[in-house]
Amino acid sequence: GVDAIGGLHVWALLPAGRLGCRQGPIMASADIWDIKIQGKGGHGAMPHNAIDPTITAATVISSLQTVVSREMDPQETVVLSVGKLEAGTAVNIIPDTARVAGNVRTTSRDVRARMEGIIRRVADGICAAMRCTAELTYTPIYPVTVNDPGATEVMRSAAVDVLGEENIVEVPVAMGSEDFSYFGEKVPAAYVFLGIADEEKGTNNQHHNPKFNVNDEVLPRGAALLAAFAMRMNGESCPHK
């Protein structure tokens, strides 16, 4: 069987060679939602003969923005973002459908379990009030990435040997998401961020940026860290840095 698992992500938010770690949630969950709003198309000159899904979509978007601020405990970490709005193809025609889509991220498993029902309630309620109907597709993608305290302490101890105590830093939760989280639901996990930022090398651009570049000089340290973690989990000593 597998006793524990370790992983790392290169991290442009930390200086090259630094290691970011924390116990508990370290990366958020990620779910995708898509709402199809059905109205009734018509001519823009005669809106009374149509049922406008575009206005309805705008109202749904505005209402969704109050979910985090009005329904969530302020101490919870939740992000609800709208990433797509589609409606119509002509400037003088009221379309019959509109589509609103986005994503939800949180570090709470309980909050995550509630979000589909909340979004459905908002979409159905707004659409009913504005004579439209809503069809929600909600797709869970990645769970919360949670670091086991014991495994994380082993990883930190290995990092002290490989990178030095001065290069270990505590990091806040990142609201990005990671499929490594699935492993953490099965066995104790330790996931860390390996800094790559070096302005002179051009490796300080944000992730998913066209100018993002990996600092290759740091990668061997990451490999050494994972090897040291595995050795410590097996009760073996690892070479000093």
Task: Report each predicted region and the residues it spans.
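Histidine/acidic-residue-rich, glycine-tolerant segments that coordinate divalent metal ions
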Residues: 1-95, 177-178
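Metal-dependent amide/peptide-bond hydrolase catalytic core
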Residues: 54-241
